C-alpha cells in the first residue's frame, strides 16, 4: 500500500491518480471533499499532519509514502517522518525543491526545505527526494488578469526559469515509489527549456489568439502584494527567489524526466495549449 499526501495539490493529485489507475492507494487529506481522485481502490483517511492519531491510521500497513508539505512554519516533515518510522514504512518519497542544491539560496523557504530533508534522513526511513524547478501551473495565477484585461503582471519579465509540468514531476515521483534502486537518491527535475515570463505571455497570446500585454511589477509593488498574502519571512523568500532567477540561477535544464520515465519533459507550449481554457474569457 502507498500513502499519498498533498493529493489536492498540483503534483499530489497526479501522483494519486496514476497510482489509483494501477492499484489500491490511500490518501491522507485534511479536506477530503476537495479530492478529485476517486475509485474503488482509493481509501481516504481524514486528518492533518499535526494529528498523530490520524497519521497512525493513515500509515497502518503502508509500504511507501509520498510526502508533500506546504507550510514552512510547521514541522510537518518531521511529524510524518517520525510516524512513518514508527509504522515501519520502507520508503518515503518527499517532494522538495531544486533550490536546496543552490549554495547561494539562503531564503527562509529553502532553508526550511533543507531542514525538512534532514528530518527525513534522520528518521531512518529509506528516502528519495524529488526536487522540481518552478511549476508551469504557477502561471494559472495570471488567469484573472488575462481574462479581465489581457495583461500579465510579474516581478521580472526577462528572468529565465526551466519550469516543469507538474505531471512530469508526478511521473518521476511514481517511478521512485514503484520502482527499485531509488532509495538514497535526490532527483532534480526541470522542464526541457528555460523560458521567461515575457516569453510565456507571448506563448499564451498565441494559444488564446488574442493580444496580451506584459507589465513588470517592480520590487516594491511585488513586496506589497506578497506581504498581503504571506507572513513576512515567506514573502521575502519569494522575492529572494525571484532575484536568483533574474541572475540566471534557475535556467539549468536536467534530463531526469527522460531518464526516469522514458519520455522527454513537456515544454511550456504544450502545457499552455492544454490549459488554454483556464485563461479564456468567461
UniProtKB/Swiss-Prot annotation:
Sites where the protein binds NADP(+): 6-11
Xref: Pfam families: NmrA
Enzyme Commission code: 1.3.1.113
InterPro entries per the UniProt record, alphabetical: Ergot_Alk_Oxidoreductase, NAD(P)-bd_dom_sf, NmrA-like
GO molecular function ontology, one term from the record: oxidoreductase activity
Coiled coil: none
Class of the enzyme per the UniProt entry, highest EC level: oxidoreductase
Reactions catalysed according to its record: a [(3S,4R)-4-alkanoyl-5-oxooxolan-3-yl]methyl phosphate + NADP(+) = a (4-alkanoyl-5-oxo-2,5-dihydrofuran-3-yl)methyl phosphate + NADPH + H(+); [(3S,4R)-4-(6-methylheptanoyl)-5-oxooxolan-3-yl]methyl phosphate + NADP(+) = [4-(6-methylheptanoyl)-5-oxo-2H-furan-3-yl]methyl phosphate + NADPH + H(+)
Gene3D superfamilies: NAD(P)-binding Rossmann-like Domain, UDP-galactose 4-epimerase, domain 1
Keywords assigned by UniProt, alphabetized: NADP, Oxidoreductase
Similarity comment text for this entry: Belongs to the NmrA-type oxidoreductase family.
Role, per record: Involved in the biosynthesis of A factor (2-isocapryloyl-3R-hydroxymethyl-gamma-butyrolactone), a gamma-butyrolactone autoregulator that triggers secondary metabolism and morphogenesis in Streptomyces. Catalyzes the reduction of the butenolide phosphate produced by nonenzymatic intramolecular condensation of the 8-methyl-3-oxononanoyl-DHAP ester.
Protein name: (4-alkanoyl-5-oxo-2,5-dihydrofuran-3-yl)methyl phosphate reductase
Chain's gene name: bprA
Amino acid at each position: 500500500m502507498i500513502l499519498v499526501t498533498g493529493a489536492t495539490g498540483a503534483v499530489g493529485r497526479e501522483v494519486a491518480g496514476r497510482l489509483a489507475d494501477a492499484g489500491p492507494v490511500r490518501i491522507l487529506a485534511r479536506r477530503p471533499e476537495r479530492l478529485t481522485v476517486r475509485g474503488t481502490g482509493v481509501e481516504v483517511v481524514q486528518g492533518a499532519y499535526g494529528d498523530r492519531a490520524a497519521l497512525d491510521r493513515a500509515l497502518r500497513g503502508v509500504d511507501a509514502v509520498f510526502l508533500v508539505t506546504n507550510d514552512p512554519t510547521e514541522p510537518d516533515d518531521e511529524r510524518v517522518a517520525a510516524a512513518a518510522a514508527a509504522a515501519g514504512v520502507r520508503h518515503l518519497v518527499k517532494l522538495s525543491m531544486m533550490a536546496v542544491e543552490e549554495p547561494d539560496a539562503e531564503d527562509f523557504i529553502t532553508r526550511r526545505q533543507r531542514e525538512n530533508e534532514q528530518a527525513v534522513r534522520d528518521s531512518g526511513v529509506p528516502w528519495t527526494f524529488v526536487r522540481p524547478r518552478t511549476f508551469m501551473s504557477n502561471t494559472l495565477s495570471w488567469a484573472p488578469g488575462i481574462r479581465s484585461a489581457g495583461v500579465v503582471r510579474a516581478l521580472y519579465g526577462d528572468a529565465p526559469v526551466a519550469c516543469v509540468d507538474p505531471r512530469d514531476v508526478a511521473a518521476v515521483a511514481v517511478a521512485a515509489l514503484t520502482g527499485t534502486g531509488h532509495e538514497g537518491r535526490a532527483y532534480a527535475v526541470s522542464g526541457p527549456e528555460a523560458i521567461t515570463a515575457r516569453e510565456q505571455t507571448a506563448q499564451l497570446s498565441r494559444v488564446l489568439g488574442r493580444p496580451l500585454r506584459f507589465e513588470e511589477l517592480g520590487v516594491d509593488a511585488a513586496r506589497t502584494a506578497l506581504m498581503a498574502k504571506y507572513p513576512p519571512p515567506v514573502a521575502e523568500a519569494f522575492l529572494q527567489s525571484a532575484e536568483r532567477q533574474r541572475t540566471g540561477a534557475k535556467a539549468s535544464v536536467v534530463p531526469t524526466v527522460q531518464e526516469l520515465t522514458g519520455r522527454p519533459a513537456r515544454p511550456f507550449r504544450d502545457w499552455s495549449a492544454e490549459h488554454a481554457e483556464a485563461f479564456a474569457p468567461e
